[in-house]
A protein has these predicted regions:
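Conserved ATP-dependent adenylate/AMP-binding module captured primarily in the ANL superfamily
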Residues: 87-114
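A short N-terminal helical cap/helix-turn-helix that marks the beginning
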Residues: 1-20
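Anion (oxyanion) recognition and catalysis
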Residues: 74
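Single conserved hydrophobic/aromatic residue that forms the stacking wall/gate
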Residues: 117-126
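Structured binding elements
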Residues: 77
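Conserved AMP-binding/adenylate-forming core of the ANL superfamily
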Residues: 18-71, 88-93, 97
Length: 126
């Protein structure tokens, strides 16, 4: 029996699929939808070559999206790298490059930050 986060959350989704899993403001996501959304992202990560021990940055505010992306990373056996929203470009680049991140999830409000100097191995996943 696997006791990793993704397996536990999948089991919960199987048992109580229609119960609320995530609540952020007015947005409510059921366990079934939580598992479905994170599975779709996990599939995209796998297809892009991320797998066990791959790292992906989460440059997101506290939100349902953060938890969905985090679970997707867990589903492929990867390691989520939390990125402080207060980081300036230089700190962001340092963290993501030195953590060996292969992907970055970010909210649109952070899209103005330049990623031109960022050298991720899988740069299509920024």
């Amino acid at each position: 029996m696997n006791l990793d986060f993704a397996s536990v959350w999948e089991t919960i989704s199987d048992i109580i699929p229609d119960n609320d899993a995530l609540i952020c403001g007015e947005e409510v996501v059921s366990w079934k939808e939580y598992d479905l959304r994170s599975s779709k992202i996990a599939t995209a990560l796998s297809e892009a070559g991320l797998s066990s021990n791959s790292k992906a940055g989460l440059y997101l505010n506290n939100s349902n999206e953060y938890l969905i992306c985090q679970n997707a990373i867990f589903k492929v056996g990867g390691c989520p790298i939390n990125v402080n929203y207060r980081y300036v470009e230089e700190e962001l680049i340092y963290l993501l490059e030195n953590s060996d991140s292969e992907a970055v999830f970010y909210h649109a409000c952070y899209g103005a930050v330049s990623y031109t100097h960022l050298t991720l191995p899988t740069s299509d996943l920024v």
